[in-house]
Amino acid sequence: MNNLKSLCKAVSIITMLSISSSNASSWASPGDSSLRSDVELLAHYGLISGPVNSWPMSWKQITRDFYKADSMTLPTYVSHAFNRVRNKTPGEVNIKTKAYYATKVQSFRGFEDEARSKVEIKGTAEVNLDSASLHIEARYNDNENFNLDGSYLSQEIGNWSAYVGTVNRWWGPGQETTTMLSTNARPMPSIGIRRVTSEPFKTKWLSWMGPWDAEIFVSKMEKNRHVPEPIFVGMRLNFEPIKNFEVGLARTLMLCGER
């Protein structure tokens, strides 16, 4: 009984910590289709500004216009979506566990987070500060494989976030797959930089682009391939010149490698 009370107390403390801050520096990673649908709906109603088709998305970008809801009369279903997203906003400390069981492992993965084996356990621990975030995501499956896919360390520098880790990415509006980067393959160790919030350019020469974001990263691919350990470079620019009309430009390169 004492152990149960201690466990309940610990869970209560974790819960309190996890909702203690809504301004933490972290990302919403691909893997939650419900969150993505809500984000796209809120963007349509003006509660989220800027591009929404590249994931991960900064939580600061997602929530920075939420204050507008106080002066808006929203349909009931939009209010529900707003509350769901707000409740998912991470706090300073977050600890989660999740178990997966699948009778058949999917050969192709969509946006939703799915197991890569029949049985899989995932644990997530996250610490968010005003300008830095440490996200540890550990997975163990029935093949006795352990990995840290989805883990990263990020630090904001002005309106940019520099990061290192194995980051899952989803570039494009597709729901089941994308033409560039998706979560179908495991993420590669990478180092990169991406924009935090999508404020438009102030200069008259580029202000026509509207809200914009960008990312560039460099990864090292695996050894077990025809050309071992090549360097993989990815770049993407998204901008919204007209409300709810988003343009995405992306480029990937594979360089070097051992022979």
Identify the function of each model-found stretch:
Residues 95-103, 136-140, 164-168, 214-220, ...:
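Transmembrane beta-barrel strands of outer-membrane/channel proteins
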Residues 51-52, 107-114, 137-142, 179-182, ...:
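Outer-membrane beta-barrel domain signature
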Residues 10-19:
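Bacterial N-terminal signal peptides
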Residues 124-128, 153-156, 194-196, 238-240:
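Transmembrane beta-barrel domains of outer membrane proteins
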Residues 51-55, 84-95, 128-134, 159, ...:
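Short loop/turn motifs that connect adjacent beta-strands in outer-membrane beta-barrel proteins
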Residues 113-121, 144-151, 156, 184-194, ...:
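Residues that define the transmembrane beta-barrel architecture of outer-membrane proteins
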Residues 190-259:
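Signature for the C-terminal beta-barrel architecture of outer-membrane proteins
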